[in-house]
Amino acid sequence: MSRRKKTFKREIIPDPVFKDLVIAKFINKMMIQGRKATSQKLFYGALKELEGKVQGEEPLAVFKKALENVKPSIEVRSRRVGGATYQVPVDVRPSRRLALAMRWLVEYSRERGEKDMAKRLAGEFLDAYNNRGNAIKKKDDVHRMAESNKAFSHYNW
């Protein structure tokens, strides 16, 4: 039996504007060096940028749909079997799906060419909403990798 203490998930406080846990997690994921106020300002600025862009859709709905489009359903894990390392496709658990989607959205919005971060975020949200952009490309790469290694799926235990 393990002697290690059981780990508990931290309770995340919902964001002050929308009272939403997913938004709070995204803001925390964006945060650099503990500057939460800056991160919040950028996120809400990005939502403000989205306001006129999509007809008949609220900015929050665009964000949620973009996040849903980026979530991977399957990924590969390295598994060592008899001296050889195989890339074994496994299902992604829901909490990791969300974390990966957020990480990719933040990462690829930072690489964009727009002037300020709010515009970059808004652009990446729009691209993900329309199923294009770098975050979607990353998800497709992960799915393609899992598809090409489907032969090793029996090593999944």
Curated annotation (Swiss-Prot):
Keywords: Ribonucleoprotein, Ribosomal protein, RNA-binding, rRNA-binding, tRNA-binding. It comes from Bdellovibrio bacteriovorus (strain ATCC 15356 / DSM 50701 / NCIMB 9529 / HD100). The keyword Membrane does not apply. Part of the 30S ribosomal subunit. Contacts proteins S9 and S11. Pfam families: Ribosomal_S7 (PF00177). One of its GO terms (cellular component) is small ribosomal subunit. One of its GO terms (biological process) is translation. Signal peptide: none annotated. The gene is rpsG. This is Small ribosomal subunit protein uS7. It comes from the Bacteria. Belongs to the universal ribosomal protein uS7 family. GO terms for molecular function: rRNA binding; structural constituent of ribosome; tRNA binding. One of the primary rRNA binding proteins, it binds directly to 16S rRNA where it nucleates assembly of the head domain of the 30S subunit. Is located at the subunit interface close to the decoding center, probably blocks exit of the E-site tRNA.
